[in-house]
Amino acid sequence: EGEIMQKILIHTEFIKLDALLKYAGLCETGGEAKELVQGGAVKVNGEVCTMRGKKCRAGDVIELDGQTVEVGQGQ
């Protein structure tokens, strides 16, 4: 479908979905992230995810408004 727009490296086991959206620059604030996720605008690995606290791990692909972010494991 869409192309991988950017890859975000995490240095922990996981990053919560709302924090990832902010970190990746897909939204400006935690409040905006919460609204987007709870409104069904965010997909994780191709499926709509409405849990903003979802743990995203290396290999997960997050989509929002046609933008795609892949989570990678940093060193």
Please give the residue ranges for each predicted region.
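A basic, amphipathic helix-loop patch mediating RNA/tRNA/ribosome contacts
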Residues: 13-58
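C-terminal structural segments of small proteins and small subunits
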Residues: 48-75
